[in-house]
Amino acid sequence: MEPAEEPGQISKDNFLEVPNLSDSVCEDEEVKATFKPGFSPQPSRRGSGSSEDMYLDTPTSASRRVSFADSLGFSLVSVKEFDCWELPSVSTDFDLSGDVFHTDEYVLSPLFDLPSSKEKLMEQLQVQKAVLESAEHLPGSSMKGIIRVLNISFEKLVYVRMSLDDWQTHYDILAEYVPNSCDGETDQFSFKISLVPPYQKEGGKVEFCIRYETSAGTFWSNNNGTNYILVCQKKRKEPEPVKPLEEAPSRQIKGCLKVKSRSKEEPLLAPEENKFETLKFTESYIPTIICSHEDKDDLGANHPNVDDINKKHDEHNGKELDLMINQRLITSQDEKNTFATDTVNFTNKAEGSEKKQAYHEINTDLFMGPLSPSLSAESSLKRDFYHSRSSSPGNEYGHPHSEEIISDMGEKGPSLGDTSSDELMQLELCSKEDLDDNANPANGSGRVCSSFDQRMACGLKNNEAGIKKTGIQDYKYSHGDSTKLEESNASSRDDYAKVDNKKEKQTCLGVNENPSKNFQSVFQTQEGHMGYPKISTEGDKANNQDLTSLLSKDITANTWAVTVDPCPSTNAKRSWREVGSGSNLEPGTSDLSSPRNFSPLTDDHLFQADRENSDSSNPENQNMNTRHRKKWNVLETQSETSETESDIAKHTKEQAEYKDMWEKTDNSRNLKATPTEHLFTCRETECYGLSSLADHGITEKAQAVTAYIIKTTLESTPESASARGKAIIAKLPQETAGNDRPIEVKETAFDPHEGRKDDSHYSLCHGDTAGVIHDNDFERESHLDICNLRVDEMKKEKTTSTCFPQKTYDKEKHGIGSVTSIDEPSQVITGNQKATSKLDLHLGVLPTDRAIFQANADLELLQELSRRTDFNAVPSAFNSDTASASRDSSQVYRHCSKKSVPSYGEEKAVTNTTLQSIPTKSEYNWHPESEVLGHAMSKPEDVFKSSEIMKSGSGGERGGGPILQQKEGSLENSQGPMFFTNEPLENLDEASSENEGLMHSGQSQCYLGDKGLVSSASATVSTQELEAQGRESLLSISTNSKIPYFLLFLIFLATVYYYDLMIGLAFYLFSLYWLYWEGGRQRESVKKK
């Protein structure tokens, strides 16, 4: 035992040694607490007591002070500013691979041999009792070995004794038993030897032997007395094999732009026919650029003057290459279009030969691949235009003109492919002026516009000379081809090519024609190159080929052919404008297109006719083109329509013929609809286009027509004694427009089928202010009560007043007068709808559109809102039998009259008619006994006369009917068709015993004469029926009044849950008081009425 030492005296030698256990009792306790067996861990408990003791040991000083900077007059916060350039710029891109230092890796190499077979292994086992069976070298300086021992006894231990310094010191490693390795005779144990960095060096040697301890004795295995030796060696990295660089072929090195090689035996000069075939324009064509020194050498050998030609066209070829790249970009975008591109056909032999020659000259420098066909034609035509302008006047106004436009497009590079609508493609052509005589206003050449709409207008304005010479012939071609287009899309492409060939021949050969005639072929040639949908604008007839080819609709070439577009196309704006702006060369023939949306609520034919006249005979009116923008928001679909208006002096004779045809087609029928049918509703309104008559010297004043439109709907069955109805009044604006002031028309459409349970749908068009008639009279007398409710009255009636401010776009160009903005509210009366309610006034208001059109003009656009019916059927339509089942069914009479302009160009009035209303039974127990059928007639004079509605007395006249008198004009002067729609509404579930008390509607008589239209109706209501209606109305009102209280109670509960009880109770009491006060006001207003 070593002598005892003091606890504080620890020498340098025994610094890392374990202290002597016999030094003192205190040290003994500390050692026992510090050194504990690893197999008996005891959890250390961190109680609160130890932490408290630790904090209690910390001395506290009561004399410490805390002072703040603000008490000393300093600021609490000190800010130090650093300049950004003083900060060192530290890059965030850390290359960890370069920073990591590479350490040398060492491995253990064995210097012993293992048993090669199991027999040798068993022989050694019988002698040595333990043998190293296998050794596995792990990554790094580690080795894992397997020891096979002879199963002598059950209890056994295997050690591996190793030494690093030739057995001066050694370590024993306990080997672990390998599970499930016992085969009855032998067992397996595993061990692992690893070298750490102090001993990990080159040439380090590890020696080990095996000691096998059993109950029978201890056995050693040392590799026959030589021990098992492992040598530490540095791991050698095998160099990565460097792949040899493959030499590229000399041809590939010389020609960097070379894509494919071409044999030298290929003839350098192809025949002219083959070269002309390369001009064919295909969708999937990709130009190939091949340029190599070998090919240039061959080319120079065959053509000694190649260098001279290259020097001559060096600058030109650079420009052509830029144009080709831009053209390729545009072509790749245009390949997405659904229209196939046709072959470019040249009609002039001399021109074709010049193109071939120019094509050969272009390809002399880049000969090994053809240029883009569109580029070849474009460049040749452009060069012909520059060099041969004086010698070829036909080409001057023909193809070079169009190619200049395409060249401008190629240089500016606009995005022209795959847009949602073709009319929105704004070609950047306005900024650059054409190179022909466009600057000369005397020639009247067409100006380049920024959109298809303006281009069509420009092509049609300056078209007078072309109309006189070849207009009718071109019309025949285009009209015939457009008819073929409607049948098949495949045949349409061929027809386009035919039309192009014929028209290009006429254009190129017609030298003396107006340049505007040839200006239109620009768009045809351009569309042929660029893959646009073909639009025939030759002559003065514009066919809607784009819309028909896209929608596959049939256009009948009769007087008023209509293309219905239930699913609006994106090309509608351009197509409708192109069609409508054409002049009608053949009387009685016109192709019309209607891009506007119609309500798909009817399964019968829809009718809408749009006509416009365009005449460019007077150069003063060429600047009178006004673009009117209208937004049609029907069923959340908007379509923009740009319009141009011009004078109508040339077409008054044709309109007179249209007048006769309208008189012939005015035969109509009275329609009776079943409850399952849908009432036709016009979801859009049409404006009356008025064009200028300034060139005729006629100064006329126009006054807007004021008309009342009343619609009522009754529904009843033979077994139900109740009826419910709807009354709608629309008042048209009354404005006075001067000679230079456009007339402003506001159009409002109502959607009343929100909340309706039946299949009836109504729409009210052409109204600035729409109100609902409320007749609260309980007397039996029959009287008229046509009124426009004020806003405060509607609030008392629990109604909603909706104001749609309208915005007028001021068109102050070319001398057109300004238009002031008029905001007129569209009032919609909304009533409560119940299962037993008699009045259904739940109306949805569609956005109100406003169209500005030119005053002093002809009425050209006519809208028909329903089916054409017979004028003679009016009395029978309004005479209802009291014994018939449909006596309470509503009869809606709508009429739009049109007066065609005679040859002297006078303005005629266009008016809207009113609707007849039949007695209804309301939720509030008031009955409009009879209502007015009003009709505003057209007048063959200069001033629009507003029709007057004569009202009978409120209570003085019993059984008296309303009389509508017209100042002037007669019904015969109106050329528009009449419309009658008759529809019974859904049945109400009431007892059939109430049939006896049913109010009997008298026969409504309509007198059609030259002076006016008279409608009268009378009915009687029994006192018992009124009382029954009152009880039912009170019951429904009381039911409705309980709903807000219940909702307020729920709000009260939620308030109490989230907030205080007193706050929720106060809110609830206040709400109850407010509801009671509002209910009292409503009762008082009802009593006053």
UniProtKB/Swiss-Prot annotation:
PANTHER family according to UniProt: PROTEIN PHOSPHATASE 1 REGULATORY SUBUNIT (PTHR12307), PROTEIN PHOSPHATASE 1 REGULATORY SUBUNIT 3A (PTHR12307:SF2)
InterPro entries membership: CBM21_dom (IPR005036), CBM21_dom_sf (IPR038175), PP1_regulatory_subunit_3 (IPR050782)
Species this chain originates from: Mus musculus (Mouse)
Gly residues: bias regions: 953-962
Residue list for modification Phosphothreonine: 58
Residues bearing the modification Phosphoserine: 40, 44, 48, 51, 67, 821
Function: Seems to act as a glycogen-targeting subunit for PP1. PP1 is essential for cell division, and participates in the regulation of glycogen metabolism, muscle contractility and protein synthesis. Plays an important role in glycogen synthesis but is not essential for insulin activation of glycogen synthase.
Keywords: Carbohydrate metabolism, Glycogen metabolism, Membrane, Phosphoprotein, Transmembrane, Transmembrane helix
Motif PP1-binding motif mapped to chain: 64-67
Gene: Ppp1r3a
Region (Disordered): 32-57, 385-420, 479-501, 566-649, 949-968
Protein name, as recorded: Protein phosphatase 1 regulatory subunit 3A
